[in-house]
């Protein structure tokens, strides 16, 4: 976490003993109040949160576009200036080494990933740059970010002096903010989900505390890592290192947004194309809902069967509790990936659920009713 922001976050954490926590490779605030209240702010108002756990890598040089296009699973070659795409970095066996959002900033490409992944990604980049005109620079100590999410996000940005046009998902917009806390250059990025208002604000580290204060003054609710994790799981978004591991294949993760099948060759592409042409993988990423509200444990096995015996068909990778309902993310064998199918997790009955989950308030806990789940 940026040190300029750290003291401000500790002060605002309302005396909680665990004010700071390690989240996605960086120290950040665990909570500012009740995480359920913070989660509600993300869903019904506007939450503001530290994005110091994200790392930024710059790619320059004449070969940068061709080279990165040959490294990742999405189309960098045709990426318009000021836009980004989500992508995987694979090994030659088609397994996932990391995930990222790659942006075309004109004179450079910018790779945005978690700090917990940055060293592996940098090492992989270094290994594959041979005679290419590509320069790689880790900007993580020169560029940091704050995020806002919720239906009031655009109004909060404007209230903080950040007036932006309508942006497409993963589109960037650079401006100079002249707010009560001072003047700063920043870049605003629209979130990937077009159904939700979500923005990242990239600034130099020396400006991040005043940006934070300006957003709070405009009416945003401060949100810590615990509520962010609740929101991530409710949104059905897998996290690398937790839900996506190096042993996983791209199609198993159900993240079609990361794949482009017409872009040409890249590291691991042969395996990805073979899966596409020959049929589906044996398991898929999906959601689970407890029937009686019993907590679901990360690492638990997903079972099906009857009195005659049970068999393992999946695993839990992330879990949380919302509105008295326990929900989870994980993998299940494809033939059992049917919304509302009954399974057993650690001896408790649960349902398979399509992703993303419905809004938390509509999830039900009665064991004799099926959960209100949005179809994928």
Model-inferred region functions:
Residues 61, 111, 148-150, 201, ...:
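Residue-level signal for inorganic ion chemistry
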Residues 1-86, 90, 95-97, 376:
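Acidic, proline/glycine-enriched N-terminal capping motif
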Residues 81-83, 165-178, 236, 241, ...:
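Glycine-centered loop/turn motifs
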